[in-house]
Design a protein with these regions (language model features):
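Residue-level signal for tight coil/turn positions that link beta-strands
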Residues: 61, 146-147, 293
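Conserved functional hotspot residues or short segments at active or partner-binding sites
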Residues: 295, 299-409
């Protein structure tokens, strides 16, 4: 038949893929069809190594939006910022491309060049030339601040994150004896998330017991819960978690778990609000389906979806006058078309600023955390007050079924 001939020569196959992807993206912004190449790319990225520019992107109004550049990659070195809109890749418009197609165009052989056109609020579009490189993501960066504070920066949650974190904590403890170490800063700012199991094991590194996160699907029986195992790697030392509007998904699970258990004080500004679970369904050689199947809930039963995590200590990062036009408003998950609702009768909120200064002397969030840990500044929210009774955190209320989508991305 004509249909069979079309499929065998590839045209029908492409049409079917486009149709499937169109149906999936109409469900919510995070559901999509991954062809074989993009499925392989996704697997490579979760392993923490791939070739490309080093940016986490999403799609908004047909344009590619930067969620966050990854530290020490060609994109971050070229000055790409969170919330930049990529309109052209090598002089070809991205309008009409799927997110996966645009990502595919941005990847390529190590050493090859690419020009991307970027729109920023208050500025004329600019072309930025970048040389592709082998992206090996250091999931955790660490250092000792002034011989008494352990600083842990988690850039994303890939398969190496928890092991990287364990090693970093061991190195800090070896360099700073227990009586000298005053506490830890866990920096999750502009961390776009990643693997659920890694967010659970990272949370577990700071907890002795209790629920870390639960996921709940459309039906109540589709609930799953994950609990901490004994063994706090930081030995109960005070912890301050830093978040901002670029902290999403797995980052929000960690911040929410440590906040609910009063294990850490969360400082910064409201997080992104991506509180949904994506399940990957492999389709053999054809690729895979990525489907949103559940929402995340913190131990106390809070839905993260389209709401985000509110810090215990709200502290805005001052943006220099000359950069204000470049740092546009961040609407977060609630600003994405067709996003899943929170599943609770609560108002949706936009996220907050994603700006983080390059120089630590200008970083009021890190510097305030250091002052709190050293006792040179005080705040009633630090250290967090323990719960009055060691009770099991409340279970999340049964969420309403997701609303039927009325718009598509």
């Amino acid at each position: 038949s004509a249909t069979r001939r079309a499929w065998s020569d590839g045209s029908g196959q492409d049409q079917s893929r486009h149709a499937i992807n169109g149906m999936l993206t109409s469900l919510d912004p995070h559901s999509s069809f991954l062809d074989a190449r993009n499925f392989r790319d996704m697997q490579v990225q979760t392993r923490g190594e791939f070739g490309g520019l080093g940016i986490e992107v999403t799609q908004e109004d047909g344009q590619i939006k930067v969620v966050a550049p990854i530290d020490d990659t060609p994109a971050s070195k070229a000055g790409i910022l969170a919330n930049d809109l990529i309109t052209h890749i090598d002089n070809e418009p991205v309008q009409g491309l799927t997110l996966q197609q645009a990502v595919e165009k941005m990847r390529g052989p190590v050493g090859s060049g690419i020009v991307i056109r970027v729109n920023r609020t208050g500025q004329n579009p600019q072309d930025i030339r970048i040389t592709r490189d082998r992206i090996v993501i250091r999931a955790v960066r660490s250092r000792i601040e002034g011989e008494d504070i352990g600083y842990l920066r988690v850039t994303q949650f890939n398969e190496q994150t928890t092991e990287n974190l364990r090693r970093a904590i061991e190195e800090i403890r070896a360099k700073a004896p227990g009586d000298q170490l005053k506490g830890y800063i866990l920096d999750l700012r502009n961390n776009p998330g990643g693997l659920l199991d890694q967010s659970i094991s990272v949370s577990d590194a700071f907890l002795e017991r209790g629920e870390i996160v639960s996921t709940r699907g459309r039906n109540a029986e589709e609930t799953q819960r994950w609990n901490a195992r004994a063994g706090d790697l930081t030995q109960g030392k005070p912890v301050i978690v830093l978040i901002n509007g670029g902290s999403a998904s797995a980052s929000e699970i960690v911040a929410g778990a440590l906040q609910d258990h009063r294990r850490a004080t969360v400082l910064g500004t409201r997080s992104f609000g991506k509180g949904s679970v994506q399940t990957i369904i492999p389709l053999g050689s054809q690729g895979a389906l990525r489907l949103t199947t559940a929402r995340y809930y913190t131990p106390s039963g809070r839905s993260i979806q389209a709401r985000g995590i509110d810090p215990d200590i709200v502290l805005e990062q001052p943006v220099p006058e000359e950069l204000r036009a470049r740092v546009s408003e961040n609407r977060g998950e609630a600003g994405l078309r067709g996003h899943l609702n929170s599943g609770q009768q609560q108002e949706e909120r936009s996220a907050s600023s994603v700006y983080v200064p390059r120089e630590q002397k200008d970083d009021v969030q890190i510097n305030t955390a250091l002052e709190l840990l050293r006792g040179t500044k005080t705040d009633p929210k630090f250290p967090p007050q323990p719960r009055r009774a060691e009770a099991t955190p409340a279970s999340p209320a049964t969420p309403a079924a997701p609303a039927a989508p009325t718009t598509r991305q």
